[in-house]
Amino acid sequence: MPVTVTRTTITTTTTSSSGLGSPMIVGSPRALTQPLGLLRLLQLVSTCVAFSLVASVGAWTGSMGNWSMFTWCFCFSVTLIILIVELCGLQARFPLSWRNFPITFACYAALFCLSASIIYPTTYVQFLSHGRSRDHAIAATFFSCIACVAYATEVAWTRARPGEITGYMATVPGLLKVLETFVACIIFAFISDPNLYQHQPALEWCVAVYAICFILAAIAILLNLGECTNVLPIPFPSFLSGLALLSVLLYATALVLWPLYQFDEKYGGQPRRSRDVSCSRSHAYYVCAWDRRLAVAILTAINLLAYVADLVHSAHLVFVKV
């Protein structure tokens, strides 16, 4: 049986979780005329326009451009699937928990589009010469920002409210799991060069911390999406609490060790960006080693805060079997 999560008081509500006072109509074209349906149409159109503008001029060279193009295409495709399921009333036949899947995707999509809206103009668009390609790239960035706001709005509308019975992924800890795994993926992208950490066992430990915490958080998300939380040998609430506490402790060590061994000269670090020859001049589609080290340090702090908030909010959840 699936696990449903509520906040302190268990109540039943027939109104939509968007708080707009009317339920989402499914299995009918009228689903598109409801506020949530219209919002998803905006998501669909904005991501479609973004990747179409870039594709029409081939403005996605390099890893950063490829990431942005993947983001828009992926978000468009999954949003289209969600709309089709809603229109045809196929929620019961969907292989994943419909109570958890849409908001999980919306949260990921908001983060994906946010990253594309920042990475694409800063690492790609600014290096384009003035002309049609640059104009299309700037317009694509604008529509990417619209998509980000639209997905974030869906998360705000459909997240759990106090006293409401809902899926775990709609709660604050569930949404924080999405943030934690997303930030970890960005960290992995920045440490893709083994030369950043292989020279020090302490830095290798940090990489192990990122991997362990990512895997545990991903398992929690997948168990909820697959509605198979009962397969664990321990109660699911205990698993979540232990996961959050362990992750806080592990990330605390990484937050100390990573900056210490990357930026302190006594431990072989490089305190000044000017000393890194790879940062001596601007490169299109490339982030120099010192900037990567700094980005990982900042992202480590962000994820530690996310895990602390996760641990605190998890104590306020009440789990019931349905």
Curated annotation (Swiss-Prot):
Residues 1-18 have a biased composition (Low complexity). It is a multi-pass membrane protein. It is found in: Membrane. The chain crosses the membrane at residues 41-61, 70-90, 101-121, 137-157, 171-191, 203-223, 239-259, 294-314. The modification Phosphoserine is found at S22. PROSITE patterns: MARVEL (PS51225). The keyword Transferase does not apply. Residues 31-163, 168-319 form the MARVEL domain. Pfam families: MARVEL (PF01284). Keywords: Membrane, Phosphoprotein, Repeat, Transmembrane, Transmembrane helix. Residues 1-21 are annotated as: Disordered. InterPro entries: Marvel (IPR008253), MYADM-like (IPR047123). One of its GO terms (biological process) is protein localization to plasma membrane raft. Widely expressed. Not detected in thymus. GO terms for cellular component: cell-cell junction; cortical actin cytoskeleton; membrane raft; plasma membrane; ruffle. Belongs to the MAL family. This is Myeloid-associated differentiation marker. It comes from Homo sapiens (Human).
